[in-house]
């Protein structure tokens, strides 16, 4: 198996297991809207359900569930095709795409299973609250950042 495939599979498996395990743990041990302060004034574990996307985008859209499922499936396909085009030495890009893939898949599993996504990571400062998120959302963000770093590295590699 090519190194990029080993990286991709390991990152997808690890990230997806962590995402789903934390969501099951939150769902089984906390009441909806319950909040547990972790770092006072900065971070709490707060059990929420999100019917929309980031920032509850399209939460009230009547066809939101089929729309988000379709978008997720298309995104997974695009990521898979993009991954297959990587060179054997593009380890960072493989890990980045794996994080994005696992994040999209983790939230897709929630949407299919529950009709919404479990969010629980609650970051805030004084009166400012960042919208709650989960491990899958974090994986997507980290993956996108790593992909940007890889693209910059690739451009520098190509430069004379």
UniProtKB/Swiss-Prot annotation:
InterPro entries reported in the protein's UniProt record: Peptidase_A8
NCBIfam families per UniProt: lspA
Family: Belongs to the peptidase A8 family.
Spans traversing the lipid bilayer: 63-83, 89-109, 132-152
Its membrane topology: Multi-pass membrane protein
This protein's name: Lipoprotein signal peptidase
Active site annotation, chain numbering: 119, 137
Compartment(s) where it occurs, according to its Swiss-Prot or TrEMBL record: Cell inner membrane
Pathway the protein acts in: Protein modification; lipoprotein biosynthesis (signal peptide cleavage)
One Gene Ontology term from the biological process aspect of the record: proteolysis
